[in-house]
Amino acid sequence: MDTERMKRVLERVYGPFAPTEEKQAPDALRESIRLETEAAARLRYLIRTSRACQNAFDEALRRCEARRRALHAEFFLREGERAARRRPGTPPGVLSALRQIVLIARARERLYESATENALPLAPETARRFAAECRAEESAAARLLALSMK
């Protein structure tokens, strides 16, 4: 195989070749989120297929969803702290929305620390607080999306 053809194949598999930039290692957090999302989707499919699967995998799905939410909280916390400075061309509301997401992610992390993974389902008060945090995060993310589309 000649080098040009090999380059084309590698670009198709791994993305465009950028000689000036150093290739970064795949982001472990993003990969973990992707894997947890795929696992949850597979478990949901199995649960839908039969009652026996629902009985067998219901707890596993709850734990998988909890891990995915914890990873998302960590991701929003990291990305929000990375984007704490205003960049040229960023609409003014985006930064405050990012700060809100960071605060919500921190609160969500504290919730996960207080409720261990094995203590599912959560205590009613913790579950209510967690649901409120989820709604607040979703509305902040929706506002951020709306601002970024303007």
Where are these regions (language model features)?
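Non-heme di-metal
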Residues: 1-150
